[in-house]
A protein has these predicted regions:
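Alpha/beta-hydrolase active-site loop
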Residues: 131-152
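The serine-hydrolase catalytic nucleophile loop
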Residues: 94-107
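Hydrolase active-site cap/lid region
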Residues: 172-226
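Conserved alpha/beta-hydrolase
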Residues: 108-127
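Short beta-strand/loop motif that positions the catalytic acidic residue
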Residues: 239-241, 246-248, 252
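Catalytic active-site module of serine/aspartate enzymes centered on a nucleophile-bearing elbow/loop
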Residues: 287-306
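An N-terminal hydrophobic leader/cap segment in hydrolases
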Residues: 4, 10-67
């Protein structure tokens, strides 16, 4: 009997050590993942003919450092080629920076909007120690949107576009903090961060156990004071009154498009959805630029108005 108890204790100890180690490693990879270099993104976008840096730099613009609530500066560029009170705020995805938002900026400025592109927390030239996939980032988005209203007047009309982490950040902002924007465009958001991590763990480690999430979350709380289970757009999307256009390419393996299907079902009208047959993660615009533009224009015309 004593030997069995010793064996049981040893097994339990090994189990705890294993999942504690996995949880710590996973939290490190997720909180401190390697970011793409700005110049690498510029070259990628230029080669794909989605970026003409000289043309972008010739647009009327202001580089602004906006104080975050978390004691760092948010690096933003306000691009204003149009004489209008209509603004788009563009939120990039994880590992990217504001340069990757320029392809959308070109689309929206052609539609008559002015645009704000900015580096998310810990990305590009914005401060911040940890990436939290929308938990703290939503407060920075709130700060950027409030800056637009404070500096361009209370009668401005703001739309927000986000892709991947930026889309999740946008939905969390709209559902938890503020409904100041007129409309939202969500491209390839996850429905819950926990489900997305389970998907990633199962792909890259072949281990999809919920226990890894539990131990990972313990280290999230200890190291960055947030819970991954609170990063859940699906829980708040029904609180958004304004129109939302959901976009998600069906071949996406990183965040399956079923995440967006769930979000769309939960959102109350007005809403619209488009699921392109081509393109991987956040490649809906890259693979279908003209259709993307038509879908966005139709959504704005039908649900917002020009």
């Amino acid at each position: 009997m004593k030997s069995f108890i010793k064996w049981l204790i040893a097994l339990a100890s090994s189990f705890i050590i294993l999942f504690t180690s996995l949880g710590y490693y996973a939290s490190s990879q997720i909180l401190f993942f390697k970011l793409r270099d700005v110049e690498v993104i510029k070259r990628r976008e230029t080669r794909a003919k989605r970026l003409n840096m000289k043309a972008f730099q010739n647009l009327p613009q202001d580089d602004i450092l906006i104080p975050s609530k978390f004691d760092y500066s948010i690096n933003a560029v306000f691009v204003h080629p149009n004489d209008t009170n209509k603004w788009m705020v563009l939120c990039h995805g994880v590992t990217e920076n504001k340069i990757s938002s320029i392809k959308y900026l070109n689309m929206f400025t052609d539609m008559g909007y002015n645009c704000v592109i900015y580096d998310a927390r810990r990305h590009g030239n914005t401060g911040g120690v940890h990436s939290t996939y929308g938990f703290y980032e939503k407060y920075d988005l709130e700060t950027v949107v409030d800056y637009v209203f404070d500096h361009y007047g209370p009668d401005v009309e703001v739309g927000i576009h986000g892709e991947s982490m930026g889309a999740a950040t946008m939905l969390l902002y709209a559902g938890e903090l503020s409904n100041r924007a007129r409309f939202y465009i969500s491209d390839a958001s996850f429905s819950t961060f926990g489900d997305e991590l389970t998907n990633i763990f199962s792909q890259y480690t072949k281990i999809g156990s919920p226990l890894i999430l539990i131990f990972t979350n313990i280290f999230f709380r200890l190291r960055s004071r947030f819970s991954l289970f609170k990063v859940s757009p699906i829980r708040v999307v029904e609180k958004i009154d304004q129109p939302v256009l959901f976009v998600h390419s069906k071949p996406d393996k990183f965040i399956p498009y079923t995440h967006t299907e769930e979000l769309y079902k939960k959102k109350r009208p007005p809403k619209a959805a488009w699921y392109p047959e081509r393109g991987g993660h956040v490649e809906s615009y890259n693979k279908n630029p003209e259709k993307y533009r038509r879908v966005v224009e139709s959504f704005i015309a039908n649900h917002v108005g020009w």
